[in-house]
A protein has these predicted regions:
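C-terminal and inter-domain tail/linker signature
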Residues: 1-182
Length: 182
C-alpha cells in the first residue's frame, strides 16, 4: 500500500470489482483477488506502453477454472474449464505512486469459455435476423498471440460473399486478359 496515493482506486471494468481507498483495496486484494487466482494461472506480458503518467500493459492471461474467481467471475462456481483471454491494464501514476488502475477484458469471451454463454442461443427478438451472437472464445486471444492462428472476419457473412464475388471476378478477368508476351 506504500506504493499508492492516499485514495487510490482499482476497477476491473467488466465486473466492477476492485475498490476505492487503501482499506477497501487491501480487503479486495487479500480476500478476493490474490487468493482467488487458481494455481494454473499464467500471465504473459505482450506489450507495454509508457507515457508521462500512465503505463498500459497488454497481457495474455489463462487459468483452469478450478475455484471461484470473484474478481472475474463473481459468484460463479468452478466449471473446470480452461480460460484464455487478453487483459489490458491502464495504471495512472501520480507522484510516483499508483493513483488508479483500470483492467479490461472481454467478459463475453470468458463466459463462452466456461459454458455460461452459448453464442448459438439467440434471444427471441433477434431470431430470424441473427444466427449466432457475435462473440468469440479463446480464439480471440490466440489471434492476438499469433495473427495467423485464426481467420479474420469469420463472423462477417458479407465478407465471405464479397470474397466469393472477388474470386469470381478475378477468375473472369484472368480468362479475358492476354499475356504481354503474346
Amino acid at each position: 500500500m506504500a506504493t499508492m496515493v492516499a485514495r487510490p482506486y482499482v476497477n476491473h471494468v467488466p465486473t466492477l470489482t476492485g475498490g476505492i481507498g487503501k482499506k477497501d483495496l487491501l480487503r479486495f486484494y487479500d480476500e478476493f483477488f490474490i487468493p482467488s487466482n487458481p494455481p494454473s494461472t499464467r500471465m504473459k506480458l505482450l506489450s507495454r506502453t509508457i507515457g508521462s503518467d500512465r503505463v498500459v500493459d497488454e497481457m495474455y492471461f489463462s487459468f483452469k477454472h478450478t475455484q471461484e474467481v470473484p474478481w472475474m467471475l463473481p459468484n460463479v462456481p468452478p466449471t473446470d474449464k480452461e480460460v484464455e483471454i487478453a487483459l489490458v491494464s491502464v495504471v495512472c501514476i501520480r507522484g510516483g505512486k499508483l493513483y488508479h488502475e483500470h483492467i479490461y477484458w472481454d467478459q463475453a469471451s470468458v463466459l463462452v469459455q466456461i459454458g455460461l454463454l452459448d453464442p448459438k442461443l439467440v434471444p427471441d427478438s433477434f431470431k430470424g435476423k441473427l444466427d449466432r451472437l457475435p462473440v468469440a472464445g479463446a480464439e480471440s486471444v490466440r489471434k492476438v498471440m499469433d495473427e495467423d492462428s485464426e481467420p479474420s472476419n469469420d463472423m462477417l457473412d458479407a465478407w465471405w460473399d464479397d470474397e466469393n464475388e472477388d474470386a469470381e471476378d478475378a477468375d473472369d478477368s484472368a480468362d479475358n486478359t492476354d499475356s504481354e508476351d503474346d
